[in-house]
Amino acid sequence: QARRLLREAGGEAALVAKIERAEAIENLAEIVEASDAVMVARGDLGVEIGDAELPGLQKKIIREALLRSRVVITATQMMQSMVESPIPTRAEVLDVANAVIDGTDAVMLSQETASGKHPALAVAAMRRVCLGAERQFEPVEELKPGTHRLDRSDQAIALAAMFLAGQIGVRAIVALTESGATAQWLSRYRSTVPIYALSRSAAARRRMQLYRDVNPVEFDARGAGPTQAVRDAIRHLFVLGHLAAGDRVLVTTGDHTGLGGGTNTLKLLVLGADGIAEGLQDL
């Protein structure tokens, strides 16, 4: 119903379901499936179901979101002591880190930045802890043939890209995406390989800021054929300093640039000294 009302009002914003009631846990799978993203609202949820149950339910919500390829945000009192203190407690550090290790896409501050004494330090501390936790990366799930139901071409391409990234040693995955859908699929399969999502759509780039491991980059491929668009994209990342000569990268793209939902191609590239892609070959 919320999505219908949004569309009738002419809106295209993503729907984030805030999980904060016991009734939501009883219908968790249905809520996650109907949403674009979910938020683990630990304050109100803890009051509803009790402190002892909260850690396990946080992990359950994150797992359910990952299983259904939805974005998940973990929030509430993550660095509460920094409302007053310039440094977080060790317990808060572990709390944030464990949420990242469990697979959350984003962590959220509230009072720490809304009315706290050290808002910038709180953001810096959370960023530092998140980056440290990502270095302790362990895959949430193994990419094995037959373990994923693939309903769309972009989903299949994303799974193939993440599987290959773990097998052939690439520097990055580059997704030319109009809507950001391919980047979302890529972010569902955990990897240590950075993902650069190139899109001309400001709305898509803002949405992709929430996707784990995804770095949105402004890029307009309209007017270029598929092969030239790929070469231009790689050159663009080279100029920005994200890629270097000799890097091997995987690229996902479609036959028609500028159209959403058309990702159907996976390519392996090697960068030359000037950032021009060489050895282009379809996989």
Question: Where are the model-predicted features located?
Answer:
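Non-catalytic helical/linker scaffolds that mediate oligomerization, partner binding
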Residues: 1-283
